[in-house]
Swiss-Prot record:
Source species, domain of life: Eukaryota
Annotated stretches, region: Coil 1A: 97-129
Name of this chain's protein: Peripherin
Annotated region described as Linker 1, given as residue ranges: 130-140
Compartment(s): Cytoplasm, Cytoskeleton; Cell projection, Axon; Perikaryon
Induction record: Up-regulated in regenerating neurons after nerve injury.
Organism: Rattus norvegicus
Pfam families cross-referenced by the UniProt entry: Filament, Filament_head
Length: 468
């Protein structure tokens, strides 16, 4: 009896379900019953933890009361009660664990269905984003880039035109600077000539003043000579008159000789006086003519110098005005060039900022797309992990169902104490088992549960009754 009970205990505790999940399997209560007709029966929960799917494992009929009407036979109720309690505890634990596993499996199924729905929604959003948003964003970016390139080309052409104008203005400015330098040099030459002319004018003025002083001195000298000549003439006249008087006086004595002598002397003095007067007049006239010519030349030179000075002054004024105008034009052109360069720099900075902003938006879109792809990949990985876990649970459940579907042999035999040497052998008994097969499938994100029942008959092992 103890041998059979230990074999039953070892057969119950060494199931594949306990080896897979750790704790002992759970069984439903009410497994054993012992009737008044000495019949022992057992049942076990099969399938997915449903208490309705039970099968009778077997029944042992004790010898009839008429056949075993011996006063000394009795049953070992204590061993049967211990086996019954152990089987009940094991079955209740197995039922509880199967219920927990079913709940966990249902949670996993719900989670998988939720994740599949999210995956389908994200896949739809991703396909929509791939089909619309990137193309539209790419189209908008390409359009913006084309517009920016066109504006950059226009700005480049405008910049080239401005550079050509700047080069032309620089050439004109160089020519104007060269002309300004030439005019400045001419002005300096004119000023130098003006200084020289002023010096010449001053020299001519000094010469004129000197000549005027000389003329005055000569006029004074001429007046003095005239006076001296008049005095000499008067003296000569006086002397002539005195000589005439003397001649008249002498004529009386020496009239013929004195008259001739006086006539000769008078003729000589008259000739000398006429000659001196003529020479003085000629010298005066020549000096006057020379001084007049010199004065005229000096006046002409002074007039020419003044005219040239006025002309140089007018040229200097016109060149100064022209230089001022050119300077104003140059400053205006330089200011316009700086304004154009600043405007071009601002526009180029704005376009570069716009291009950078579009590139940043494109980069953000790419990063968002990459993030969606990573999330999608993570969801795919989670789905694959859940599929693998579901497949593992499915394999475990299929293995457990296949293990449960194997015919269950009898796990206990009753020992009767008797003094009769021969005991009627027990009749062969058959067990009937109802197997409940539950199949859980996931189709298009929905859980499909199918159940089927199968009735099996299996022959129980024959157990011998040992007597003491």
């Amino acid at each position: 009896m103890s041998h059979h009970s230990s074999g039953l205990r070892s057969s119950i505790s060494s199931t594949s379900y306990r080896r897979t999940f750790g704790p002992p399997p759970s069984l439903s209560p009410g497994a054993f019953s012992y009737s008044s007709s000495s019949r022992f029966s057992s049942s076990r929960l099969l399938g997915s933890g449903s208490p309705s799917s039970s099968a009778r494992l077997g029944s042992f009929r004790a010898p009839r009361a008429g056949a075993l009407r011996l006063p000394s036979e009795r049953l070992d109720f204590s061993m049967a009660e211990a086996l019954n309690q152990e089987f009940l505890a094991t079955r209740s634990n197995e039922k509880q664990e199967l219920q927990e596993l079913n709940d966990r499996f249902a949670n996993f199924i719900e989670k998988v269905r939720f994740l599949e729905q999210q995956n389908a929604a994200l896949r739809g959003e991703l396909s929509q984003a791939r089909g619309q948003e990137p193309a539209r964003a790419d189209q908008l970016c390409q359009q913006e880039l084309r517009e920016l390139r066109r504006e950059l080309e226009l700005l480049g052409r405008e910049r080239d035109r401005v550079q050509v104008e700047r080069d032309g203005l620089a050439e004109d400015l160089g020519a104007l600077k060269q002309r300004l330098e030439e005019e400045t040099r001419k002005r300096e030459d004119a000023e130098h000539n003006l200084v020289l002319f002023r010096k010449d004018v001053d020299d001519a003025t000094l010469s004129r003043l000197e000549l005027e002083r000389k003329i005055e001195s000569l006029m004074d000298e001429i007046e003095f000579l005239k006076k001296l000549h008049e005095e000499e003439l008067r003296d000569l006249q006086v002397s002539v008159e005195s000589q005439q008087v003397q001649q008249v006086e002498v004529e009386a004595t020496v009239k013929p000789e004195l008259t001739a002598a006086l006539r000769d002397i008078r003729a000589q003095y008259e000739n000398i006086a006429a000659k001196n007067l003529q020479e003085a007049e000629e010298w005066y006239k020549s000096k006057y003519a020379d001084l007049s010519d010199a004065a005229n030349r000096n006046h002409e030179a002074l007039r020419q110098a003044k005219q040239e000075m006025n002309e140089s002054r007018r040229q200097i004024q016109s060149l100064t005005c022209e230089v001022d105008g050119l300077r104003g034009t140059n400053e205006a052109l330089l200011r316009q060039l700086r304004e154009l360069e600043e405007q071009f720099a601002l526009e180029a900075g704005g376009y570069q900022a716009g291009a950078a902003r579009l590139e940043e938006e494109l980069r953000q879109l790419k990063e968002e797309m990459a993030r969606h792809l990573r999330e999608y990949q993570e969801l795919l990985n989670v789905k694959m992990a859940l599929d693998i876990e579901i497949a593992t649970y499915r394999k475990l459940l299929e293995g457990e169902e296949s293990r449960i579907s194997v015919p269950v042999h009898s796990f206990a035999s009753l020992s009767l104490k008797t003094t009769v040497p021969e005991v009627e052998p027990p009749q062969d008994s058959h067990s009937r088992k109802m197997v409940l097969i539950r199949t859980i499938e996931t189709r298009d994100g929905e859980k499909v549960v199918t159940e089927s029942q199968k009735e099996q008959h299996s022959e129980l092992d024959k157990s011998s009754i040992h007597s003491y």
